[in-house]
Structure formats: structure tokens, C-alpha cells
Amino acid sequence: MRRDGVFAGLLAALVLLLLPGTALAAPGDPWVAYVANSVVTKQSAAAPVILRADPATGALAEISRNGAQGDLFRHPYDIAVAGDGSLLVADMGAYATSTDHTPDGRIIRVDPVTGRQSVVASGEHLVDPAALTVAPDGLVYVVENVGTARTPAVISVNPASGAQSVIAQGGELCYPFGIAFEPRGSLVVTSYGDFSDGTTVVNCAYDFGALIRIDLASKSQSVLSRNAPEWGNLFRNPLGVTVDAAGRILVVNQNGGTALMGVDPNTGVQDAESPNTGTDRFVVPQRPAVTPDGDVVVSDFTLDDLEGGLVSVKLSTGAQSILRQDRTLFNNPLGVAIVPNRAPAAALSAAPALVAGGRRVSFDASASRDPEGLQLRYDWDLDGNGSFETAGGTTPTITRAYAGTTTLTARVRVSDPHGASAVAGAVVRVDSIRPVLSGLAIRRSTITYRLSEGARVTIQLQRKVRRRWRAVRTLRQNGVAGRNRLRAGSRARAAGRPRRVRYRAQAFAVDVVGNRSRVVRLRVSAAAARRLRR
């Protein structure tokens, strides 16, 4: 395997990393693959269209199909992941014919969490959009396979407004099906070459296809590689194309004995990476995507079960293995996109962490972070039973009141759009038991009492004036569980005290969370009252 120009490739990769919106990935980082099936019905019923494969768990999940999530899919041809984590799908609509070039193609956005479909752009220049790529600045570049005037083109699409602009048209482009963004700031496009199915006939200048570079500054086209002595003779109807982190170009041939080939971005020289013979996994390979480890995942239209799936290629050896195959979910896949996906970091705080029964606790997970900067979703286990019964959407805060006395660990599960998640917990203590104050007694200037738990105790000496009890002195103490003693200090005697007055002591306790005991009252003699008032 050729690895020329590594230093130049690393410099190009550095340029890419400096551009805003570029996701950073390192060898060993976890990742998932998204797949777009090209056939949207099976046995006259809506079938899965967008799938997600997780190589770490082996899981294959359906993300979206026509129905409750939308009804926009007709002929999906490619898929890419936008900077915000949403999925972008190039859909051809109804295939163009020799007499009908109706611009009914679409770029569809799919929410990877809900599967909901929405239109980013449609019509205008989009007749049969065959592929798309997302630049580091978020702009989407689309290969238009046919064109309204039967002239293929490359179209830019603003993902926010859907506005379309023609970047390149005609020229070297002939039956193009693949596009990729290069770190140097240009595009590479695969021209398929000659094609005939009995109805559609395409004749290209380069029978077996070519790789075209488009300079975005000048919008000029040039042939980067094709079948020729100076480049090699490996092109056999190239369809998909991608660029690895070092800037090296990887192309998938739909036909011929070389399924995956590398193309030097500086010289155009071709290098066979993985074969397609009768003993290989490949049958009808379509598009490549590069993993963080530098290996390649290729979509195959049929595989050996005619439904297709994903093939993993170890780039250092060219060895192939089935990454995922499932007759229920795969339906002739074309598009494949890989997104590095490290798990988020979850954080949770509870305030107050110790609370009285019936009062609300506020939970805050806003300190949680996603390594790729994607929006997180929050699911809550507020009763501490281990099941996340409360969906919080994208709101990182929630409140809950607890009635009974308990100690529990509430948890939050934070999930990114691509299925990675993490859990954090916070301990909550709920105290709904009122403190018990008993054994109130006064002997000379000393007050004693008992508490069931530590609490703040308030003791008032009251006298009765005209049928109403009025406080004449208030004492407070932080009591402990068990027996407590409070010695009342002397205070100046009030002047003009009536000689015959009734006195009482009234006491209550409030614990640390605000639970209040019942009031305890004790009749106090005038002599004892005089001592307490001193």
C-alpha cells in the first residue's frame, strides 16, 4: 500500500482542524455509522431507510422511515452528518428520464434522535442529486447527476436557508455519483464513465470513469486521475469517494476486480487497497467512509443475501469482514457516513440535598458536556429505582417533591444525538419526621428538656395580660438528641410588674430542614418566673 506524501497530508489535515466546525477524532475513538437504504418500501409497505450501526455493541437501529416521522424519502442516494449532529440525505425523488428532467430532488434533514424528516432544499437545480458532502464551515456541496438541461453539476446548498448556487457545471463531469471535500479546500468528484441499461445510455470521454478535482476559488475543473499509464489502470466505474485525515483519497469501484483504491492527492497515482473477486465479501460495493482508526467502511448494495450491508476493510492489509448484515433492516444501501462519537460527561447537582418532606428539590445537569459539542438530551430517574422514567428532552433542569422520609440517589442520563450516553447521580435525603420535644422542666433559672433529634429550640416565658399571653423573654438553643440543659442568664427586672400574674413557658423545636415540633407548654410559678426574668 502506498503511503507517499504523508507529511504533506498531515499539513493538510492541520489546516482542516483549524477550520471552524471540524470534529476532532483520534485513533481509538468510538464511532457509529449511518446508512441510507436506496429502496424505501418492502412488499408494498414502508421500510427502514436510515439506519445506525454501532460497531462496539453490534447494534443496528432504525432511525427513520416514511410514515409518522415524515414522508419525504423516494430514492435516497447518499448521507452525511452535519456539524450539529443532524443527518443530511440526498434524495433523487422520481428518477429523471430522457424526456422528463423535473427538478424534484431534495436534500432532507433527519433528526437522529426522533427520526423526524424535514426539507433543507428541493427543486431548482436538484433533479437527481446523487451525493453530498459537508464542508468544515457547514456548507453542503451536492453532486447533481442529471441537471435540468441534462448537464451534471455541483451545487452548493446553504443548510440554514436552503439557497442553492451552481459551483461547476458540465465540463469534465460525466454521470457523477460521488463527492468529497479535501483539506486543501477543493472538491473531488467521481465521474462514473459509460453506462447502459437498455433504456439509459451514457457515453463519457473516459469509458471507465475518472476523478475530477474542482477548485472552489476559481471553480475550475481538472482530471486528477483516470485510467492512463502515468496514473494506473484501476478505475472501473467509480461511485463513492472520501478523503482520510491525511488528505489521501479513497474511491470505491462499483465494478471490476478492485473494490477500494487509494488515489494520491498530489500525483493522482492509483493504489489497490481491497479486491472484489468471487471469494471476497464485496458484491456490488458503493460508498466508503473512514473510521477514526483510519480503516474504511464500505456500503454494499447486495452482499450475498441481495439486501446488502456494510463491509469493514482493514486498510493496512486490505482484509475484509462483514461489519453488519440484516435482511430485516437493510434494503440495498447506498449512502454511508461515519461520525466519531465519544460519550458525554454527565454531571448532576441537587439543591437542597437535605429537604423536608413535601418540599421541592431542584436538580441541575447543566454542567454535563459532550466532547463533540452536540446538544444533549436528559432522562431522569428521580425515585432512585434505576429506571429513567422521566424524559426531560433538552432541558437540563427539573424539580421534584418527596413526601416520605427516605435517602435516595437520583440520577440523570445524558445522551448525545448519536446514542452515546453517560449517567450521573446526586444523593437526596428527605426528612418528613417532626422533632419531638418532651420533658420540659424549670428549676430555679435552669431549663431542661429532651429532644428526639438535633434541632433549634425556642423557649418563651409568657405572662397573661387581659386574657392574652404575651412573651416577656425568649431563649433559644441548638439542642441535641437526648437531654438538654439551658441556664437562663440574668436580665434587668421590668419595672411596674403586677403582683399577681400568671406565667407559663412555651417551647418548640425546628430541625435542620424546617420540620417543627408540636408546642409544649408548662405552667411556671411567679417565683420561677422572677428568676427567669432577672
Write out the residue ranges for each language-model feature.
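Solvent-exposed loop segments of extracellular immunoglobulin-like
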Residues: P371-D379
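Short, solvent-exposed loop/turn segments at the edges of extracellular beta-sandwich modules
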Residues: V414-A420, V510-N515
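Solvent-exposed segments in extracellular or luminal domains encompassing
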Residues: T394-L408
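Residue position within the beta-strands of beta-propeller blades
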Residues: Y34-N37, L88-A90, Y141-V143, V188-T190, ...
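Glycine-centered tight-turn motifs at strand-turn-strand junctions
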Residues: R468-P498
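Beta-rich, blade/repeat-based domains predominating
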Residues: A26-P30, A45-A47, Q69-D84, D104, ...
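Short loop/turn segments immediately following the C-termini of beta-strands
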Residues: S38-V40, M92-A94, N145-G147, Y192-D194, ...
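Acidic, Ser/Thr
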Residues: D364-E372, R450-S452
